[in-house]
């Protein structure tokens, strides 16, 4: 059964994303963040296209079954992380594809479901997992050290008051477990103050915790390099991101792949690498005034796109050294 219209995820920059993807008859495309299927639905309007939809959220996969039935076998849905898109394609007998589109971050559907624990706007269990495995946000809040919590809020949430927030959490959890979104939001609001018209005091802390719980930035790094490997020459990669951390990763990825490398004595395998992407969007595409008026969550969205060249995929760079679930929860 499809989710009701009230909880359907609106594909931000949906028309622009599909325009830059430029699907064509007979092409095979990966919708790496299926959500409510907005991109997939648009791609399937082109006769002869095939879509592999990926989402780590089994609720989204279940919600797409109607579209699968309507697609006459042209849509396949797979529950997986988008960092695994190359393996997913291989499992479907697909070696290379004509395009990959991804909408990075939490979906409106997830934000609007109180039981998922993503939003401070609704009281619910402090969960925040996009999938259904791994540590929940409540478990991280209960177990992480004060220093680790401060790093999580500062690095992933860009919260200037991260140390004060972490200190308040450690003091509060010694008295009562913090297991609901309201409890955490109320606690953060006592430490971080905002003026009328500014974002909610808990916005950055919730963002940082969510990104950490889902390893979102690592996933994005891996998904971009996976897309590079599976795209045919002439295939397109289109990425919509929603905050500066994500956009910086996407921008740097295209910048590195969009120019020839002269090599590095630190990474000899990079010698004489030719550009693996031609950058299509010299500047990010942003939503129109009409779209942001209809969907305020779109206001921070940025779209970047590139076209795969015939050059070999560039070697995968090491992931940045930032807090991970394995390192933080392993220190309990």
UniProtKB/Swiss-Prot annotation:
InterPro entries: RsmH (IPR002903), SAM-dep_MeTrfase_MraW_recog (IPR023397), SAM-dependent_MTases_sf (IPR029063)
UniProt-annotated stretches for the region Disordered: 281-332
Principal location: cytoplasm
Binding site for S-adenosyl-L-methionine: 37-39, 55, 82, 103, 110
MF (Gene Ontology): rRNA (cytosine-N4-)-methyltransferase activity
Annotated EC: 2.1.1.199
Superkingdom of origin: Bacteria
GO terms for cellular component: cytoplasm
Catalytic activity, reaction form: cytidine(1402) in 16S rRNA + S-adenosyl-L-methionine = N(4)-methylcytidine(1402) in 16S rRNA + S-adenosyl-L-homocysteine + H(+)
Keyword tags: Cytoplasm, Methyltransferase, rRNA processing, S-adenosyl-L-methionine, Transferase
Family: Belongs to the methyltransferase superfamily. RsmH family.
HAMAP family: 16SrRNA_methyltr_H
Official protein name in the record: Ribosomal RNA small subunit methyltransferase H
Source organism of this protein record: Rhodopseudomonas palustris (strain BisA53)
């Amino acid at each position: 059964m499809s989710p009701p219209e009230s909880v359907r995820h609106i594909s931000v920059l949906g028309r622009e994303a599909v325009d830059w993807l430029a699907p064509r008859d007979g092409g095979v495309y990966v919708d790496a963040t299926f959500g409510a299927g907005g991109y997939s639905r648009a791609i399937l309007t082109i006769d002869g296209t095939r879509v592999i939809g990926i989402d780590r959220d089994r609720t989204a996969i279940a919600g797409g079954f109607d579209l699968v039935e309507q697609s006459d076998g042209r849509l396949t849905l797979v529950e997986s992380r988008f960092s695994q898109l190359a393996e997913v394609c291989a499992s479907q007998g697909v070696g290379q594809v004509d395009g990959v589109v991804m909408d990075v971050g939490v979906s409106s559907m997830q934000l609007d479901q109180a039981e998922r624990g993503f939003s401070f706007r609704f009281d619910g269990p402090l969960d925040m997992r996009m999938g259904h495995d791994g540590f929940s946000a409540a478990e991280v809040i209960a177990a992480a050290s004060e220093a680790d919590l401060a790093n999580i809020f500062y690095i992933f949430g860009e919260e200037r008051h991260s140390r004060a927030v972490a200190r308040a959490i450690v003091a509060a959890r010694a008295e009562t477990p913090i297991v609901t979104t309201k409890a955490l939001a109320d606690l953060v609001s006592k430490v971080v103050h905002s003026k009328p018209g500014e974002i909610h005091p808990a916005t950055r802390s919730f963002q940082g915790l969510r990104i950490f719980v889902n390893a979102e930035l690592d996933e994005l790094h891996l998904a971009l390099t996976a897309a590079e490997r599976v795209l045919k020459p002439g295939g397109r990669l289109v990425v919509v991101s929603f905050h500066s951390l994500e956009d910086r990763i996407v921008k740097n990825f295209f910048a590195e792949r969009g120019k020839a490398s002269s090599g590095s004595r630190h990474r000899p395998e990079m010698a004489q690498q030719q550009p693996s992407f031609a950058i299509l969007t010299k500047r990010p595409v942003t939503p129109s005034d009409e779209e942001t008026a209809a969907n305020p969550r779109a206001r921070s969205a940025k779209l970047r796109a590139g076209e795969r060249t015939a050059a070999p995929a560039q070697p995968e760079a090491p992931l940045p050294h930032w807090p991970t679930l394995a390192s933080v929860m392993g220190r309990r």
